[in-house]
Amino acid sequence: MMTAGKLRIGVLGSGKGSNFVAIANAVERGEINAEIALVLSDVDDAGILAHARAHRFPAQFIPPGKFRTKLDDEAERAVVGGLQSAKVDLVVLAGFMRVLKGEFLRAFEGRIVNIHPSLLPAFPGLLAWKQALDHGVKVTGCTVHFVDAGVDSGAIIGQQTVEVLDDDTPETLHQRIHAAEHQLYPRCVAALAAGRISVQGRRVTWKRD
């Protein structure tokens, strides 16, 4: 995914945007050969928009429409159009709480990434940290993956493990997974920006330095 210049990143988020902050900080430190081209949110007072504007990144609220779990067609066209106008190379989902549909997936096929709080394919979907506790696993973690039409089912780019402690609660485990996400996501985006990621079907390999 390496481009002639810096990778242009578009970010979608619905909440505080802590993973976006981790990536943006890595960009500003020169650890990722990229620039934040656009930040979009379906929540008008989302923290991710406030942070983006405070750091003078282009940021916009997109009214999501009438559905609770997905964008309506008009909103999806607005998101696609905004990202295309910003000449985005890679779409980064950072706590975006709506399902992406066919038009969006086709427009950015192979160029959308997400992070999930489990070691996929284990525990897809919501409350993955609670699923891990309920199943009694001893190790969980987080996964960066490409986005496809399924639920947390795209090809896996990278993973980081987190030990499950005997006295963990859903809240304490979630906090440690979240901290791991802030390490893993920038590392994976940096590898994509540097052209170090190769994809063949479901197999993703990293070119070593």
Model-inferred region functions:
Residues 1-209:
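One-carbon transfer enzymes
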